[in-house]
């Protein structure tokens, strides 16, 4: 896809949401230690699971086909059991960790924790008006607009609904 660089920002990125590198990057970040902290879900496994069609977005992490994984080369009974346990443990991570894990532009771990403390749950945040978001100390108009845009995107709304169905509901 086309590379873009938002005005005033240093980094370029692929604007295609379905770009394989974008998909892998979102899943790797989601599973990383600072985010949902899913042990055994590193870069190589993400590459393998995306290539094999086991995951296409972060919600798919919670509906893995463990029987299919067990049949794959390099996966024994113990590694599959450990992976399942790590994924199950991630269902109960805090709202701050989830918000950071979702890679919402301008929402780093500190901002994610501020939002979680202010709104308490995902439902309250999803319906929050711009003025409510901006009223949180440490959250300015750029962050508020970025968050509101992300929440208003239908793909992200569907993703949040799928995460809830999968038991991720901090």
What does each model-identified segment do?
Residues 1-170:
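Accessory alpha-helical DNA-binding modules that contact the DNA backbone or grooves
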């Amino acid at each position: 896809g086309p590379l873009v660089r938002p005005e005033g920002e240093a980094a370029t990125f692929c604007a295609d949401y379905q770009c394989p590198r974008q998909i892998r990057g979102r899943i790797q970040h989601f599973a990383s230690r600072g985010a949902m902290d899913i042990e055994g879900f590193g870069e190589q496994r993400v590459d393998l699971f995306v290539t094999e069609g086991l995951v296409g977005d972060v919600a798919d992490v919670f509906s893995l086909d463990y029987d299919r994984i067990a049949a794959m080369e390099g996966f024994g009974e113990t590694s599959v059991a450990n992976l399942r346990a790590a994924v199950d443990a991630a269902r109960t991570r805090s709202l701050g960790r989830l918000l950071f894990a979702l890679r919402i532009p301008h929402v780093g771990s500190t901002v994610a924790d501020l939002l979680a403390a202010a709104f308490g749950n995902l439902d309250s945040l999803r319906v929050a008006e711009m003025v409510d978001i901006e009223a949180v100390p440490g959250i300015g108009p750029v962050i508020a607009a970025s968050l509101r845009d992300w929440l208003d995107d239908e793909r992200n709304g569907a993703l949040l609904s799928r995460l809830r169905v999968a038991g991720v509901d901090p």
